[in-house]
Amino acid sequence: MIFATKERDVQLKRLDKLISGIRTNKVELLDILTEIATYDSAEAEIESSIATLLGAEEEVERYNPPTIDRIAVYHSSNVLLYSYVLYAAIPSLFCKEILIRPSTKALSTMVKLHDFLMKQADIPSQLLPISQRKFREQAGQSDVVVFTGNYENSLKVQQTYPQALFLYFGAGINPFIIGEKANIEDASKRAVAARVYNSGQDCMCPNVYFVHENMKERFLATLIQDIKELQIGKRNVPGNVIAPLFYEGLSEQAQDYLTQMKDRIVYGGAVDLSINYVEPTVVVSSLEKIGEVIEFFCPIFHVVTYRDEQEVVDWLHAPERVESTLGASVFGVPELVEKLRSTHIVSENLSLYDIENGNHPFGGYGLQANYVCHQGNFTSRPLLISKEVSAVFGRK
């Protein structure tokens, strides 16, 4: 049974108040979010959050999750508002208590955000900025645990909640694949927008762009021109999509990578460690010499040329990478869509940002991208908390 109708009405009115508060106090909220995010990405995050809150009633009607007592959330270090909506606000429709441990990387901003949201509506959530050990003690017998972050860390934390439904939200390679039939101008604009979301500091940003060798020169020329038009400056100024990075150590990581790839840089390449800044940079490789593809968390565009689409499929499905499959954006290669759908959530002629919907399952089929664990059984699939709660607790 879900909450009785009267109780559900109270919960929905609470979310209505939250939506109203976000809209009314948007300037204050933007001031908080732009401590970490660029102004434009913060605005996009607010709009996505409102859209998800507006879809909450339909979501819980669709999946019909039963009432549970407690969710423990190991919160993300980025997209703080949107994550809060997904992991706390929406679950408040079917969960009595939500305990949140903020990421230490974004602690002060998360405290401000939590205080702001609690002023708008009395969501049954508590923010607990304490150690993992103390949080585990306080979380007690949680019905559900939500963990974002490092895959290896998730496995360690999961072992401490053997009875809980454990949901892991991670990251992936998120390739763009651009074929001979692609609309290059459109593909380039979406490629840039996806890579520079919050200056590249997002786990959905693409980390590699596979481009058919016959389209290489045209794509690179278009891509570089689109990059040249980007506004650069302080993150809290509207229109500035590239800014100094927020998270410590990212510019050092980028510098190390770009030093290794210096002979392949065709645009950009400057790094300023003193302000944690990485210039938008284009690196070009062939598939044979691709090297390691890492999660940059900064505006590096790694363009990799290929001759045959099956080469790309084989590379993505290699044993050392198949567990990192989350999303793939396919442009002008319709025959690839079905080949990748068994392992990725696929966007055709769109980016992952274009298709994400907070009221529907999202993610890939690699354990390092996302998984659900219950009673010792690990399964990777696109996740949505209400759906997973319904599947496990609705059986009782």
Summary of predicted features, one role per range:
Residues R23, E58-D186, E348:
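Rossmann-like NAD(P) dinucleotide-binding subdomain of oxidoreductase/dehydrogenase enzymes
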Residues M1-I19, H114, K119-Q120, Y277-K396:
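Conserved C-terminal structural/oligomerization subdomain of aldehyde/semialdehyde dehydrogenase
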Residues C95, V145, I178, H212, ...:
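Residue-level signal for inorganic ion chemistry
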Residues Q141-D143, Q163, P206, K262, ...:
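Short, well-ordered alpha-helix to beta-strand connector turns
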Residues R8, M118-D122, N153-S285:
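ALDH superfamily catalytic-core signature
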Residues M1-R70, S83, I90:
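N-terminal Rossmann-like NAD(P)+-binding subdomain of aldehyde/semialdehyde dehydrogenases
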